[in-house]
């Protein structure tokens, strides 16, 4: 007699409920949940995408060598730390910074800080160096440094003459003035912004003057072809310029956008073309080149421009994307634009970082992080401003060798230098005496509004701890 009920067989196994959540992530989208596509999270704080999985970011790391120098006031050899009062008085306050790549045989890369009366150089494996200014020269406000061949040029802004260092450790920093002026040339004027381009130094002076120096000589320019007036008489002010393609510069003014183009080495065919775009741009150091585009941050948010077409007589038309930051619009609305002049940007092989001030911050202590590999916003990063209150991004020093890899360093106005996305589990940005200044990293992830049938957004806070 057959049993009335057969045992449960493999074909009779009930189906398990299907998961409705995201199996992997591709970035951050802060719009309303119904607008967020699958694979995106509503918010990510201090997080990184690793093969579709969000993990806590690594921290700031200040190497011990970042506060070494070969001399302090009054120039005696020493091993310098934060507790050296003479060093702090003379060289802690920093007005600008960047990188000096020695073009000589050694090819060393140094982090450079601009202080009141000297340039301070630091790098791995060596005691740093201090290059003093010539007597009577000082820096007392925000400045920009650029390198053209072996020269470092310090742009002081306003009506102040720019400075330069010739690249030899025995030299001092001097004013950027010609020893003699060739016929048909003029001395370069004071500038608010500069860059090296096609063996020339390009300076933005006053409201309208785009000045291109002579080749190999940053002190003077051709008075006929080396200066062009950009949107003259319209009331807006020159802010920044970034190389675009092989023969053009994207010139950003406070309220207008232009393309300067010159194919001829002598600049005899130069032209300037105004682009049809509205903008309010007050953050010159956010203008950078990456992925064959120019990126910048203005009141509309992060925007990009690339060459759309080149017409007759080398007229350049741009393709402008003003929607880049639409997915992080809530963060853009929180930016403290009062401090826009302090904002900056940096590029690595994997990411683009925009340093800004949010909400009540008065210094750039927030990073908006764009992931170049997935072409999406990855996170916004902040650090503990209670424990690390004085650490903020004044300037970036990209591709600085440390522990056999190029690292992105940030330079703070208090003289601290730290590599980003390196130290595990905490931020370390310097020392008080011999005690490290540390702060834990808190990461928060908010989903796009539904997971496994739930209509509620979920927040997760976690700490990733690695024990060796």
Label each region the model flagged.
Residues 1-153, 277-293, 299-468:
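Beta-sheet repeat architectures centered on beta-propellers
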Residues 115-117, 157-159, 198, 206-208, ...:
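Surface-exposed loop/turn positions within WD40 beta-propeller blades
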Residues 126-131, 168-172, 219-225, 265-272, ...:
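Beta-strand initiation motifs
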Residues 119-122, 162-163, 202, 250, ...:
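Conserved hydrophobic/aromatic positions in well-ordered beta-strands
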Residues 119-123, 249-276:
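Surface-exposed extracellular loop regions of Gram-negative outer-membrane beta-barrel proteins
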């Amino acid at each position: 007699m057959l049993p009335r009920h057969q045992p449960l067989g493999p074909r009779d196994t009930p189906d398990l409920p299907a998961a409705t959540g995201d199996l992997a992530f591709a970035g951050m989208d802060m719009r309303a949940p119904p607008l967020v596509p699958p694979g995106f999270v509503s918010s990510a704080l201090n997080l990184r995408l690793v093969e579709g999985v969000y993990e806590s970011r690594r921290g700031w790391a200040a190497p011990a060598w970042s506060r070494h120098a070969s001399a302090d006031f009054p120039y005696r050899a020493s091993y310098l730390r934060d507790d050296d009062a003479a060093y702090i008085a003379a060289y802690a306050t920093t007005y600008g910074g960047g990188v000096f790549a020695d073009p000589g045989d050694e090819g060393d890369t140094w982090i450079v800080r601009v202080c009141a009366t000297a340039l301070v150089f630091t790098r791995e494996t060596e005691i740093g160096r201090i290059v003093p200014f010539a007597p009577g020269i000082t820096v007392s406000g925000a400045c920009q440094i650029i390198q053209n061949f072996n020269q470092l040029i310090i742009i002081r802004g306003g009506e102040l003459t720019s400075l330069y260092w010739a690249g030899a450790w025995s030299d001092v920093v001097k004013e950027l003035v010609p020893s003699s002026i060739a016929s048909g040339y003029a001395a370069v004027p004071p500038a608010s912004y500069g860059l090296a381009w096609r063996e020339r130094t390009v300076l933005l002076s006053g409201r309208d003057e785009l000045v291109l120096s002579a080749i190999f000589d940053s002190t003077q320019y051709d008075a006929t072809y080396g200066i062009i007036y950009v949107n003259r008489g319209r009331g807006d002010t020159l802010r920044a310029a970034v190389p675009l393609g092989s023969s053009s510069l994207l010139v950003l003014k406070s309220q207008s956008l232009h393309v300067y183009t010159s194919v001829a080495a002598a600049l005899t065919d130069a032209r300037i073309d105004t682009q049809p775009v509205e903008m309010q741009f007050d953050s010159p150091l956010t203008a950078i080149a990456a992925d064959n585009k120019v990126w910048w941050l203005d009141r509309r948010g992060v925007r990009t421009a690339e060459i759309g077409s080149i017409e007759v007589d080398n007229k350049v038309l741009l393709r402008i994307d003003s929607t880049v930051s639409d997915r992080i619009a809530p963060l853009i609305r929180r930016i403290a634009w009062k401090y826009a002049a302090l904002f900056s940007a940096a590029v690595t092989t994997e990411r683009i970082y925009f340093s800004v001030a949010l909400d009540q911050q008065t210094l750039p202590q927030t990073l908006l992080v764009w992931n170049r590999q997935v072409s999406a916003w990855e996170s916004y990063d902040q650090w503990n401003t209670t424990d690390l209150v004085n650490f903020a991004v004044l300037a970036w020093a990209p591709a600085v060798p440390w522990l056999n890899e190029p690292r992105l360093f940030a330079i703070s106005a208090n003289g601290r230098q730290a590599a980003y996305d390196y130290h595990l589990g905490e931020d370390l940005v310097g020392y008080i005496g011999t005690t490290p200044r540390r702060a834990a990293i808190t990461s928060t992830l908010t989903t796009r509004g539904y997971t496994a049938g739930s209509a509620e957004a979920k927040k997760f806070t976690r700490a990733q701890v690695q024990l060796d």
